[in-house]
Amino acid sequence: MAKRKEENFCSPENAKRPRQEELEDFDKDGDEDECTISFTNGTSTLTAAEVGIIESIQLRNFMCHSMLGPFKFGSNVNFVVGNNGSGKSAVLTALIVGLGGKAVATNRGSSLKGFVKAGQNSADISITLRNRGDDAFRANVYGDSIVVQQHISVDGSRSYKLKSEKGTVVSTRKEELIAILDHFNIQVDNPVSVLTQEMSKQFLQSKNEGDKYKFFMKATQLEQMKEDYSYIMETKERTKEQINQGEERLTELKRQCLEKEERFQNIAGLSTMKTNLEYLKHEMAWAVVNEIEKQLNAIRDNIKIGEERAAKLDRKMEEQQVRLNDAEKKYKDIQDKLEKISEETNARAPECMALKTDVIARTRAFNDAEVLYNRSLNEYKALKKDGEQLCKRIEELKKSTDQSLEPERLERQKRICWLKEKVKALQDQEHTVNQEAEQFEQAIEKDKQEHGRVRKEDIEVRHALNYNQRQLKELKDSKTDRLKRFGPHVPALLEAIDDAYRRRQFTHKPIGPLGACIHLRDPELALAIESCLKGLLQAYCCHNHADERVLQSLMKKFYPPGTSRPQIIVSEFRDEVYDVRLRAAYHPEFPTVLTALEIDNAVVANSLIDMRSIETVLLIKNNSVARAVMQSQKPPKNCREAFTADGDQVFAGRYYSSESTRPKFLSRDVDSEISDLETEIENKKGHIITLQQRLSALEKDIKRNEELLKRCQLHYKEIKMKIRKNISEIRELENIEEHQSVDIATLEDEAEENKIKMQMVEKNMEQQKENMENLKSLKIEAENKYDTIKLKINQLSELADPLKDELNLADSEVDSQKRGKQHYEDKQKEHLDTLNKKRRELDMKEKELQEKMSQARQICPERIEVKKSASILDKEINRLRQKIQAEHASHGDREEIMKQYQEARETYLDLDNKVRTLRRFIKLLEEIMTHRYKTYQQFRRCLTLRCKLYFDNLLSQRAYCGKMNFDHKNETLSITVQPGEGNKASFNDMRALSGGERSFSTVCFILSLWSIAESPFRCLDEFDVYMDMVNRRIAMDMILKMADSQRFRQFILLTPQSMSSLPSSKLIRILRMSDPERGQTTLPFRPVTQEEDDSAS
């Protein structure tokens, strides 16, 4: 509730007449104990109240009621009766809330939103206040009644409509409602005006006597008077400070006034110096014109030199463009040669592999045939030798006549046959072991080749794993700082750039990395755009070469020697993007790199256009469609190349696959990339484990085969030794001269059989030799073909190596020429800017010359010859002006000094008058406040005594006694009640009373406050809930008696009783509430903070 107007405190005569008479009686007695009041049952005023009482209330969707009212209240006593839940308390709550009270003041909820019926969007309250008679509020606007309508939304906000008697909306501002309540002296947050059952319970059970005192002060509005007094005293102290400041200012003004008066007496003429000053000004005007003319001539000379230099730079740029075209043509020619060689090499690779496989197969077939032939040859030689020995032996036997040693010879012959069979078996075993050794050697060679291949694959997979792990770390770091995608040092480098820019080391702050300054319109094109821009995504832009040198020095701190640094692009910063509409590529279905990017910074867009011509590069997601657009038909106009979603680069006649499989810098879905990388890393780790297992298995196979090979070789040696030993023994036996008789016929048969075997072996050997020769020729033919194709491939490789070196040199040359061209373009641009600046300066100087000449003619129409410079004349003018000012300072101008003197005197007199007025005001205010404070203290004592007497008188009607002790110094109030006779029971705190006794005492206390408090209506909720029948009847009689004596006030009493025993009177109106709907027993409240209610209010 807003403060009352100050005149309410300053004008005691505005109070009600009865109170004024009582105060005068109190002043006459002079002592509180002697102050008496007469209680009468007669009516003090028989007229009904004209302003401020409640005429009607109507509720909609309020608390748990869809519609209540309208309730028409009488002008005096109104009983609202009904069972619990019927809406009695809702009417009282609506009265408090509807007249601007806060939700917490109702003790029914902590937020306005809790008063909206469950399931509804809003609630409405309509209260009609009486507005008649002489004290009506803006009667010409509102009429005889004021309708206050409040709309409460479900979110806790509320709005007001203040309507006239005719229903016209007069205002929607809360300030208007506060003015109405102040005018009618209505305080809805004053518990004396509206006392809820919960407020009464809290007050009477409060242990803090200071709270009761505050209750009393607020109910009687003494608290408001006290606050008004304090405010006036603070205002008085501030006014005293203003008076003290004014007195200090008066002293200073008086001193200044005397000084002005003294200076006025010492004024002298200064005409000669003023004449000289005017002549110097004439010379100064034309001296300025002379200097501007000299500056114009110098600027014209500079422009002429600049135009010649611009033409020279144009020629150099044309020469540089020719060199760049030659370098690009050379690079393209070498690149075409390399591509042709690469295509031819790739085309011959499958044939080479097939021929190599054929050579290996034919070599193996030839070796097998050669082994068979050698074996047959050895067998033939052995048979031949055996035949020769048999023939020799037969001859020897035929000559021998001695048959005595025949048994020994036969034994030797038998031994020889056995040894030969053993040699034959050993030779077969030798052949088998030799074949096994060859198989082991081939297996070892094959395993070693496989081991080398797997080992190489393992190294490649490990390199890829390390790269993926670094990429994963960068991605995880980029989740917290996206800039780390462009390198781990980038955030620190950007901080260093910011710091250097703050220290003004840069002309313009460098921009970069460029990848952080662009955004994709289509995330699926991320890899394509990265493949196109490559290192430019990590590049930085500088305005000039001075900024580039500063940035290079900063980069040295973060990029160690030997490591690659980001590229720096030097180009003057512009605020607008280049107009590329005439040279940009266009396709109705596919965007260019420029249109596929969102680039907010014009410098970034211009740099990418300069360095990569992104307006001419198309982006086509599908590979086959890209080939069709660029190669199967004529490429779109102005389109040089295209990139696919897989990062492949497509030219009109070439196609290059991308080395990358995923974007590194421009991907938006970092979590998905991290997940994919983690999966790929796990797969690679699993692959490495598989490769390691494969390597281990191959190493075991190689070791096992090598051991088996050693065993075979050792076995082979042992067999060889056995064969040599047996052959040696056979030869020894055959060389022994046998003189024994032998069976010549048997030997001859054996010789014949040996001859037949020799023929068979010879025939077989000839076939094997023929087969071997055929296989040899086939092997040689395959080797020749393989060597031929291998030689061609090696020749192509030898041709490609110098071409690669030439391509690198040509690429460097192209970059060098581009930098050279960019250098001249930058210089030309910088020079043209300077030249244009000079031209603009020339225009400005010409305009300035015209202005200065016009000004000079106004000062001196005839041009005069000036020999002194403008600076010298300026110094002379300043010296003369200072001399004149010094004379003015010592003497001054008469009119000016007179004017200053009059102003100082008037200021002094005005301030002196104000200070005197304030002094009189403060003196009068102190006298008034002293009198008013005494009156306030007397008024407080009178109200205190009246409250005590009313309380005692009301308690005595039930044979109770009570005490009210006021301590105004400590601001406390203590209340005690004695239920029985004064000498039969002791005084007790009200909390010790029974429910009925406490309720009765509460009514007595409230009636006491009602008797001394000002308010057009009083509301009391369930005042008799704890009373027995006797106390209820007595309390009712007391309330009706008071109401009858105060017909100018309205009483609204809420009770669950039927009130059927009330006397019949036109002053009493009973409003009966309908019983609540079945099941409706609680209200839909929920806890809300105090701040919500305050904000809603």
Curated annotation (Swiss-Prot):
Q: Region labeled Flexible hinge — which residues?
A: 458-667
Compartment(s):
Nucleus; Nucleus speckle; Chromosome; Nucleus, PML body
Region (Disordered): which ranges?
A: 1-32, 813-839, 1078-1097
Q: What start and end residues bound the annotated signal peptide?
A: none
Coiled-coil region: 232-348, 376-457, 668-920
Q: Does the keyword Nucleus apply?
A: yes
Write out the GO biological process terms: cellular senescence; DNA damage response; double-strand break repair; negative regulation by host of viral genome replication; positive regulation of chromosome segregation; telomere maintenance via recombination
What job does this protein perform? Core component of the SMC5-SMC6 complex, a complex involved in repair of DNA double-strand breaks by homologous recombination. The complex may promote sister chromatid homologous recombination by recruiting the SMC1-SMC3 cohesin complex to double-strand breaks. The complex is required for telomere maintenance via recombination and mediates sumoylation of shelterin complex (telosome) components.
Q: How does it assemble?
A: Forms a heterodimer with SMC5. Component of the SMC5-SMC6 complex which consists at least of SMC5, SMC6, NSMCE2, NSMCE1, NSMCE4A or EID3 and NSMCE3. Interacts with NSMCE1. Interacts with NSMCE2. Interacts with SLF1. Interacts with SLF2. Interacts with RAD18. Interacts with SIMC1.
Per the record, the similarity remark reads:
Belongs to the SMC family. SMC6 subfamily.
Q: What is this protein called?
A: Structural maintenance of chromosomes protein 6
Give the source species.
Mus musculus
Gene for this chain = Smc6
